Regions:
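Terminal leader/tail segments of proteins
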Residues: 1-112
Length: 112
């Protein structure tokens, strides 16, 4: 995991705002949610109350986007990972692989 991703994950875990290079974390105290922004795209929103994670590429299925999403998934110990095959994104667990779609929500090891 890259240093920037470790710092990003620390900000999510500690519920603080953080910014470095092209990545930032915005914590909203009113909603108790952390939003991860890559460039100008919110790629993940983590609800600390429900422990649900909403994923989004904003159409930017780049190596960096996948790396940031996988770092978050690893930190939250969701059991999921994002990968690309033949230009299509997928989300996998130990049990299944599904097509990735923007707006998918993960919670309790399930895709909602």
């Amino acid at each position: 995991m890259r240093k920037i991703e470790q710092q990003m994950n620390n900000a999510i875990s500690n519920k603080v705002d953080w910014n470095s290079s092209n990545t930032r974390v915005e914590y909203n105290n009113n909603t108790n949610c952390s939003t991860v922004v890559l460039h100008r795209t919110a790629i993940a929103v983590y609800d600390h109350n429900t422990q649900a994670l909403k994923l989004n590429t904003g159409g930017w299925q780049s190596v960096t986007t996948k790396s940031r999403l996988n770092a978050i998934l690893s930190e939250l110990k969701c059991g999921f990972r994002v990968f690309q095959k033949d230009f299509d994104l997928y989300l996998s667990t130990n049990h299944q692989t599904v097509d990735f779609w923007d707006g998918m929500i993960l919670s309790g090891g399930q895709i909602l």
